[in-house]
Amino acid sequence: MNQNLNLSPTAAPMPVQSPAVRRRNFEEVALGYDEITAMEEARRCLGCPGAPCRGGCPVGVHIPQFIAKVAEGDFAAAWEILSADNPLPAVCGRVCPQENQCQAVCVRGKKGESVAIGRLERFVADWHRAQQEPKAPSCAEEKGKKVAVVGSGPAGLACAGELARMGYSVTIFEALHTPGGVLAYGIPAFRLPKDILHEEIAGLEKLGVTIQTDTVIGRTIPVEELLKDGFSAVFLGSGAGLPNFMGIPGETLCGVFSANEWLTRINLMHAAEPGAATPLMPAKQVVVVGGGNVAMDAARCALRCGAEVTIVYRRGREELPARAEEVEHAEEEGITFRLLTNPVEILGDENGFVTGIRCDTMALGEPDESGRRRPEVVPGAQFTLDCDAVIMAIGTTPNPLLHRTTAGLAADRRGRLTTEEGSCRTSLPGVFAGGDAVTGAATVILAMGAGRKAAQEIDEYLRKNPSH
């Protein structure tokens, strides 16, 4: 046995801002490991020969190898291993749900807590960022071919980075004024500081990736025009940014927001800051509908804007889809959870402003097709919550613009682009797609995995079709 192995059954805790302090600022909640803590946690890794953790990583990071280098204190080598497969390690170390992926299959987790893989990933990425002259990844010899990437979210960034390393000339087309996609507009700074996102994107630009913002492909430039304009292939990674609503009375009242709008105003338009050009309405009592990570983000932002916040969710605590860590942080900060609660109407005054939300009390019945117990209405148990703002955080779907403006580009009835089974190939030759645009809203790391897979398929396609 390795004499330096750390046999502790528990992972090193993550230092965080105290709830009383952080509930009134947008600074990062988690503070990160120091070198000693990172090395001690890394020594908990058994270095399993079969590396089940790597199989649980959508981008295939060589997890035991990079952790072994952390244990040795060779952080530069750890970075080389980590960054070879993950172009956004500082992002993933903060927002990836490792507990459901790599850490879920960690052998140490069978008799205690899993190795804190995500925290170690974050540590290595932050250590690298702190170096005066961080080393840029190397690229293969230029292939003399151009590839267009539509969307600069996780899928697009991962695809672009992989292609650039292969030697392709890559241009990303982004509809917004700043790159990052959902990483920029959807995740608050207290979970993902924007300077970290910008630095990781700058790392891709050092590989030669060009980013063209304020360009809506499908409207400003048709997809077909990209192929005619010298691009040998196109990757569609436009995400799923169209918010869902419940279709209940009152959703058009003043004070009803989609979580997308609420978070975009705060993250991109700085609406929570004094003197903002597009300020948020000064809500005092906010109800957030939904139980996922987006609901937690919207609720915690509303809290930091000075409101009392209640999250309503139609199932129980065990069924909450948000990360356990995010739920715990929200509760620590003073957010109220009303579980087994389903809105049926948003109430308003004679001027059209929100005054409350009427809800049914629910009970859990038999499992539905998702495997979760189906929520059923409890008769005679309806009630009303007073509020002056409601935020709908019940999911998103892909924007139909691309398939509606591109002849022959197939999509399903939900607007998700369709691809060949097990592949990223769309119905159009030379056009590939992946991430939320194909699957619907999912996780950052799954989108990145799809982007990497698409890059490999594009490379294979162009090798087989050298005339393109």
Where are these regions (language model features)?
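Glycine/serine-rich phosphate-binding loop and adjoining beta1-alpha1 elements at the start
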Residues: 55, 60-139, 205, 213, ...
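Feature captures the FAD/FMN-dependent oxidoreductase FAD-binding
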Residues: 77, 141, 146-150, 198-248, ...
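Residue-level detector of alpha-helix initiation sites
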Residues: 87, 153-155, 178, 292-294, ...
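Glycine-rich dinucleotide-binding loop and its adjacent helix/turn
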Residues: 124-141, 199-219, 243-305, 412-422, ...
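N-terminal Rossmann-like FAD-binding beta1-loop-alpha1 element of flavoenzymes
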Residues: 146-171, 295-303
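Rossmann-like dinucleotide-binding cores of NAD(P)H-dependent redox enzymes
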Residues: 169-172, 176-207, 211, 299-345, ...
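FAD-site-proximal beta/loop scaffold in flavoenzymes
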Residues: 252-283, 367-441
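A conserved FAD-binding loop/helix module that cradles the flavin
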Residues: 298, 437-465
